[in-house]
């Protein structure tokens, strides 16, 4: 695939802690239900999976937020559960219930059936990456992503989202051997999956460890971070003549920042409970940081959003040898007012230009 030269590489340079003229911004779940145009496309597709498994629809919704806002990166429209779906677990999105699996992994016989899926069964994802890259035409970089081995395992064992993680923690404490086997398979599958996204044209990749923060200290390192590190160590890090940065985001992982930063990633994503300046001192600018505005700030109105954006940028401090990508501390809420996102993007770009110039 012939690719257009990148017109805006500020996001990639910030991830690599290179000098940039301003702080780049993108938002987790930026292509999503808060946008009326997304809901219209989803209605045409008929279902979430109808949207995610059709490269043209996936491309359409990936580009929608960029038509509204001058964001500095696009992120592939997909779901972290495509990999276990390809393992045969039967992913379904019930209206109002979120994702669930028809065949959760609960015992030894279930684990014995698991295998790294043939990446050809996920071709629709890689086709979407190629389509999006073509349509972006070098405007901004494209981010690929996957769930961390632990986070995917939570859904695989629980069968759906959970409030207490009782089923997977029962396995963790009662049959850790089974859980390690699941995590080994997940790590291998995720490595292949992300490398295939990179081969298709993803210019950066992100691992979402959405549920790492539910683990006790010591167990996080053993059951989450160790397998995240396996994935990161096996990724293609050079493509199209430049480095492919890797972002690792553990929601609730503030106490483990130093250890996450040492896993081989280029950037660590932060949730909103962590002070950016403190986090920066703790990782000593060894990696870039991404985050970390509370998503609920968007419900406070334009003035509050602009003030909190400035506060977040000030918290990071003088850029110097550090790297900062502005984002929310978690995915944007489906109820967020789209017009306030415009205020956020404008404030980050305008205010940070002055900071970088000084």
From Swiss-Prot:
Domain of life: Bacteria
A Gene Ontology biological process term: protoporphyrinogen IX biosynthetic process from glutamate
Catalytic activity: uroporphyrinogen III + 4 H(+) = coproporphyrinogen III + 4 CO2
Cellular component GO terms held in the UniProt record: cytosol
UniProt pathway annotation: Porphyrin-containing compound metabolism; protoporphyrin-IX biosynthesis; coproporphyrinogen-III from 5-aminolevulinate: step 4/4
Protein's cellular compartments: Cytoplasm
InterPro entries membership: UROD/MetE-like_sf, Uroporphyrinogen_deCO2ase_HemE, Uroporphyrinogen_deCOase
Name of this protein: Uroporphyrinogen decarboxylase
UniProt cross-references to HAMAP family, sorted A to Z: URO_D
Organism of derivation: Bordetella bronchiseptica (strain ATCC BAA-588 / NCTC 13252 / RB50)
Single GO molecular function: uroporphyrinogen decarboxylase activity
Source organism phylogeny: Bacteria, Pseudomonadati, Pseudomonadota, Betaproteobacteria, Burkholderiales
Site residues by UniProt (Transition state stabilizer): 79
């Amino acid at each position: 695939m012939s690719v257009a030269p990148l017109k805006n590489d500020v996001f990639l340079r910030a991830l690599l802690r290179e000098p940039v003229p301003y702080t780049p911004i993108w938002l987790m779940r930026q292509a999503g239900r808060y946008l009326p145009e997304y809901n219209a496309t989803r209605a045409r597709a008929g279902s979430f999976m109808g949207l995610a498994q059709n490269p043209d629809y996936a491309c359409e919704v990936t580009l929608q937020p960029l038509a509204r806002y001058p964001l500095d990166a696009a992120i592939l429209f997909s779901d972290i559960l495509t990999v276990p779906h390809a393992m045969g677990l039967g992913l379904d999105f019930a209206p109002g219930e979120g994702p669930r699996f028809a065949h959760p992994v609960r015992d030894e016989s279930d684990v014995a059936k698991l295998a790294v899926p043939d990446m050809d069964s996920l071709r629709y994802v890689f086709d979407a990456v190629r389509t999006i890259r073509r349509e972006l035409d070098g405007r901004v970089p494209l981010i690929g992503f996957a769930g961390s081995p632990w986070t995917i395992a939570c859904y695989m064992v629980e069968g759906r989202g959970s409030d207490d993680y009782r089923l997977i923690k029962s396995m963790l404490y009662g049959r850790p051997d089974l859980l390690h086997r699941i995590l080994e398979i997940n790590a291998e599958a995720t490595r292949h999956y992300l490398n295939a996204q990179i081969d298709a044209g993803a210019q950066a990749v992100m691992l979402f460890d959405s549920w790492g923060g539910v683990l006790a200290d010591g167990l996080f390192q053993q059951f989450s971070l160790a397998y995240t590190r396996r994935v990161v160590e096996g990724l293609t890090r050079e493509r199209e003549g430049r480095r492919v940065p890797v972002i690792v985001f553990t929601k609730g992982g503030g106490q483990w920042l130093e250890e996450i930063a040492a896993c081989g990633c280029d950037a660590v994503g932060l949730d909103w409970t962590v002070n950016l300046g403190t986090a920066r001192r703790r990782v000593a600018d060894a990696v870039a940081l991404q985050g970390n505005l509370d998503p609920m700030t968007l419900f406070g109105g334009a003035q509050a959003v602009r003030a909190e954006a400035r506060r977040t940028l000030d918290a990071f401090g003088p850029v110097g040898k550090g790297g900062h990508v502005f984002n929310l501390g978690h995915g944007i809420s489906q109820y967020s007012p789209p017009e306030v996102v415009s205020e956020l993007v404008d404030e980050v770009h305008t205010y940070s230009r002055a900071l970088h110039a000084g």
